[in-house]
Amino acid sequence: MPAMVEKGPEVSGKRRGRNNAAASASAAAASAAASAACASPAATAASGAAASSASAAAASAAAAPNNGQNKSLAAAAPNGNSSSNSWEEGSSGSSSDEEHGGGGMRVGPQYQAVVPDFDPAKLARRSQERDNLGMLVWSPNQNLSEAKLDEYIAIAKEKHGYNMEQALGMLFWHKHNIEKSLADLPNFTPFPDEWTVEDKVLFEQAFSFHGKTFHRIQQMLPDKSIASLVKFYYSWKKTRTKTSVMDRHARKQKREREESEDELEEANGNNPIDIEVDQNKESKKEVPPTETVPQVKKEKHSTQAKNRAKRKPPKGMFLSQEDVEAVSANATAATTVLRQLDMELVSVKRQIQNIKQTNSALKEKLDGGIEPYRLPEVIQKCNARWTTEEQLLAVQAIRKYGRDFQAISDVIGNKSVVQVKNFFVNYRRRFNIDEVLQEWEAEHGKEETNGPSNQKPVKSPDNSIKMPEEEDEAPVLDVRYASAS
């Protein structure tokens, strides 16, 4: 049979003119192969060689004008048949573009990004939260002894002019390393005019005692130079009548005295003393204006009251005369006393920090509540039947609590108050409960014999209801006189 040639499909409208030579060459090769099939074996071999050369020439002729764009593939089958497939590279790009939509714009909500609405209030709140974030400047360390810490603070104050808070902040910055902190102290200049509330109160108190004698004031504020005291005095002098702590305290005391006097007058009412005072006032009004003695006395009293109010320290500050005399007596003694007080203040602040740290740790542990640490409650159901152990336990509870049925019920655990009362009635004779109660009354007195006032009296033995287990159980020996017999 003649060999069948499979021709690859062509795309219509693309390169038909160029493929005419390849088609004619393929047809010639096919006719040569058909004629060779009917000839002798020798002729068949010759014609096969000619056909193969013709097909090779056709392939080269087809590839030359197309510049490598068209390709021919021939494969020999096991039975001698051959097949060829041809395809074009130019058509592959167009088909892929058609499959993927041509690479155009993608329209639709699924291709768009979701942009949140602009909220200026939320933005301002976030910026405010960032601004309000605090920074930790000091935290105590257990590995650092108090003696080393006091020595470090003294060096920072005397040599470099740091106050206690600044020195501790530097130490915390270097992770509680004293050597690094001491080496870094000269590299910074502390703010010299930083006046805390305590410093301002001490200055006002010292100024009320010593006036403008600044070297005396410096004895109460040893970490301040005289130049700093003078500078603060002139800035404090301008606003003294408005913002002075001592003046506010004096005005407050004066207002409290006036209110107390008004309350006393309202409480007394129109009594004979008020009438006499009113008469005295009228008589004073009748005095000629030349006599101004009472007015002078009032002015003297008012000035004395003002002086007394100014001499008193502000609220929360206590000064004794001995301490003031010790500070004012000698400069060295004043420095020693103030240094001791400063050390005490440092130790107290350190204790406060340790307590705060301990409290914060305990609060972190209690974030989940106390339920994990609570012991499981054993809930026992009430049982109407009395075992031997429960009977003995009830008798011992009666010996201790008397007629307190609630306490006896709590001791037993699985018996209610009503069941305890029934036990009193049903087992009175068996356990000699009357004698046990008499012993309890003799020990605690007769005032508590009736038990709590909200409990009802126990029924008499005549009206008692016998429990079924009383008939079934064997007689039990007396608890107080238990013997082998």
Swiss-Prot record:
Main location: nucleus
InterPro entries: ELM2_dom, Homeodomain-like_sf, REST_helical, SANT/Myb, SANT_dom, Trans_reg/Corepressor
Record region (Interaction with HDAC1): 78-257
All copies of domain SANT, residue ranges: 190-241, 381-432
Summary of subunit composition and partner proteins: Interacts directly with GFI1 and GFI1B in a RCOR/GFI/KDM1A/HDAC complex. Interacts with INMS1. Component of a BHC histone deacetylase complex that contains HDAC1, HDAC2, HMG20B/BRAF35, KDM1A, RCOR1/CoREST and PHF21A/BHC80. The BHC complex may also contain ZMYM2, ZNF217, ZMYM3, GSE1 and GTF2I. Interacts with REST. Interacts with the SMARCE1/BAF57, suggesting that the BHC complex may recruit the ATP-dependent chromatin-remodeling SWI-SNF complex. Interacts with SOX2. (Microbial infection) Interacts with herpes virus HSV-1 ICP0 protein; the interaction leads to the disruption of the BHC complex, thereby preventing the BHC complex from repressing transcription of viral genes.
SMART domains assigned: ELM2, SANT
GO CC annotation: DNA repair complex; histone deacetylase complex; histone methyltransferase complex; nucleoplasm; nucleus; transcription regulator complex; transcription repressor complex
Organism the protein comes from: Homo sapiens
GO molecular function: chromatin binding; enzyme binding; transcription corepressor activity
Localization of this protein: Nucleus
Compositionally biased spans, kind Low complexity: 49-64, 74-95
PROSITE patterns: ELM2, SANT
Record protein name field: REST corepressor 1
Composition skew (Polar residues), residue ranges: 450-463
Outcome, altering Q112A: Reduces BCR(KBTBD4)-mediated proteasomal degradation
KW Ubl conjugation (keyword) present: yes
Sites of the Glycyl lysine isopeptide (Lys-Gly) (interchain with G-Cter in SUMO2) crosslink: K122, K297, K466
Entry coiled-coil feature ranges: 244-273, 334-369
Function per UniProt: Essential component of the BHC complex, a corepressor complex that represses transcription of neuron-specific genes in non-neuronal cells. The BHC complex is recruited at RE1/NRSE sites by REST and acts by deacetylating and demethylating specific sites on histones, thereby acting as a chromatin modifier. In the BHC complex, it serves as a molecular beacon for the recruitment of molecular machinery, including MeCP2 and SUV39H1, that imposes silencing across a chromosomal interval.
Biased segments, Basic and acidic residues type: 278-288
Entry note about domains: The SANT domains may bridge the nucleosomal substrates and the demethylase KDM1A.
